[in-house]
């Protein structure tokens, strides 16, 4: 789950190519995140399905944005811009 050091959580499952792409975008930008495999965490799966009302992955949760559900590279770019600007003090 998210910590003060990793403000982004990506909920995913094995074999999810869009999840891998999103992780690669964040890695390339140097943005830290946690990954939660929904097939191994029943509590997280319930949270994603019942609270977030998400039926597809990836699901990206952060304190500063609405959850990003599904593969939405434009929204991920906004998230990256926000976190990289925050790190540089802009």
From Swiss-Prot:
The keyword Transcription regulation does not apply. Disulfide bonds join 16-19. GO terms for molecular function: electron transfer activity. Signal peptide: none annotated. It comes from the Viruses. InterPro entries: Arsenate_reductase-like, Glutaredoxin, Grx-like_ET, Thioredoxin-like_sf. The keyword Secreted does not apply. Keywords: Disulfide bond, Redox-active center. Pfam families: Glutaredoxin. SUPFAM superfamilies: Thioredoxin-like (SSF52833). Residues 1-90 form the Glutaredoxin domain. PANTHER family: GLUTAREDOXIN, GLUTAREDOXIN-LIKE PROTEIN NRDH. This is Gene 56 protein. The gene is 56.
